[in-house]
């Protein structure tokens, strides 16, 4: 019988049971507990120690942009090869010359022609990955799937991460049925469906309040036949977001505690979900208590949490609590935005 692998020493079957129980409780109480209800391509920073004659990633991107815009795709191919040799990997701007204009179709066909001619291995695979991500950004999902087929036929290293931008785009647009068909396509090529792939579905359902579908996604994660799968930080972030959107602060807090018990790092955004719902629900004192419970561990987190809370309190005219938070920020030497700094000077320092 399949079991989820414990992250540390906690049986994550219990975790999933807890999360599904929240769904059941939400349905029984007529609340929609939506909590169970980058792969992005980062720009590689230029090497600061590079010799003066060595090109940077930005320079390679600019050269590829000029070559692609002028229709010189042999130059594009050479640049794709040479940039990897020089440790200047592809970025989100590499295929920026490809846009939704009249030249789109011909440019894409030229790219399909030259990509199989790039250096075999990482260079070729990553070029396909980067182009697929670009097509998804342009909303050209069908063309992205054509490239997937090209990779499969050519045996160019088709892998799970290649599908991530497609699944991300489809689920964000609530094209769930299409996204599941992409999952079936992955399986047809013997490509494993990883936790990130499932997270795209889970986030979409939690955001929309589809309790039943989110619960089904969790079950699919448990039953995944490719191997042991554990929820990750993004999984729990989606669950906390869903709980907060349904007004279930206690459920969000329970999930947050579960993350800490299992040793998972908590995203700044996850804290923001909880803070926002507490203020929205009128739990002002509790929101202050919540941010203070995490204060002192991470300066940037403190700036995000305390600053966000202060802004929300001021917007709701909860000036007493806002002053308390701003005093704490001042004592801790935390950075304030212009609006908060002005409020602090007028209402805290001069009071």
Curated annotation (Swiss-Prot):
It comes from the Eukaryota. InterPro entries: Pentatricopeptide_rpt, TPR-like_helical_dom_sf. Residues 1-41 form a transit peptide. It holds the Pfam family PPR_1. It is found in: Mitochondrion. PPR repeats lie at residues 124-158, 159-193, 194-224, 232-266. One of its GO terms (cellular component) is mitochondrion. Keywords: Mitochondrion, Repeat, Transit peptide. Gene3D superfamilies: Tetratricopeptide repeat domain. Transmembrane segments: none annotated. PANTHER family: ATPASE EXPRESSION PROTEIN 3, PPR CONTAINING PLANT-LIKE PROTEIN. Belongs to the PPR family. P subfamily. NCBIfam families: PPR. This is Pentatricopeptide repeat-containing protein At3g56030, mitochondrial. The lineage of its organism: Eukaryota, Viridiplantae, Streptophyta, Embryophyta, Tracheophyta.
């Amino acid at each position: 019988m399949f079991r989820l692998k414990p992250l540390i020493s906690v049986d994550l079957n219990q975790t999933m049971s807890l999360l599904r129980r929240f769904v059941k409780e939400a349905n029984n109480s007529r609340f929609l507990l939506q909590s169970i209800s980058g792969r992005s391509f980062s720009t590689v920073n230029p090497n600061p120690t590079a010799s003066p004659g060595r090109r940077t990633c930005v320079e390679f991107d600019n050269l590829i942009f000029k070559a692609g815009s002028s229709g010189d795709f042999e130059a594009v191919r050479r640049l794709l090869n040479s940039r990897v040799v020089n440790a200047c990997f592809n970025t989100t701007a590499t295929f920026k010359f490809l846009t939704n204009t009249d030249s789109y179709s011909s440019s894409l066909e030229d790219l399909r022609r030259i990509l199989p001619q790039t250096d075999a291995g990482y260079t070729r695979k990553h070029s396909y990955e980067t182009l697929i991500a670009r097509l998804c950004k342009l909303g050209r999902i069908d063309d992205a799937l054509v490239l997937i087929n090209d990779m499969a036929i050519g045996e160019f290293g088709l892998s799970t991460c290649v599908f991530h931008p497609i699944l991300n785009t489809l689920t964000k647009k609530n094209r769930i049925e299409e996204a599941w068909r992409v999952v079936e396509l992955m399986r047809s090529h013997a490509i494993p469906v990883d936790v990130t792939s499932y997270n795209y579905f889970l986030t979409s359902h939690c955001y929309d309040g589809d309790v039943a579908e989110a619960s089904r996604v969790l079950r699919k994660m448990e039953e995944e036949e490719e191997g042991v799968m554990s929820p990750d930080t993004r999984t729990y972030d989606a669950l906390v977001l869903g709980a907060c959107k349904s007004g279930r602060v206690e459920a969000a807090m329970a999930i947050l505690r579960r993350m800490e018990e299992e040793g998972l790092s908590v995203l700044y955004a996850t804290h923001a979900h909880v803070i926002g719902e507490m203020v929205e629900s009128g739990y002002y004192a509790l929101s202050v208590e919540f941010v203070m419970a995490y204060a002192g561990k991470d300066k940037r987190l403190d700036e995000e949490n305390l600053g966000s809370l202060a802004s929300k309190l001021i917007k709701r005219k909860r000036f007493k609590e806002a002053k308390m938070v701003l005093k704490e920020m001042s004592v801790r030497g935390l950075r304030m935005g212009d609006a908060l700094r002005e409020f602090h000077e007028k209402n805290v320092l001069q009071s």
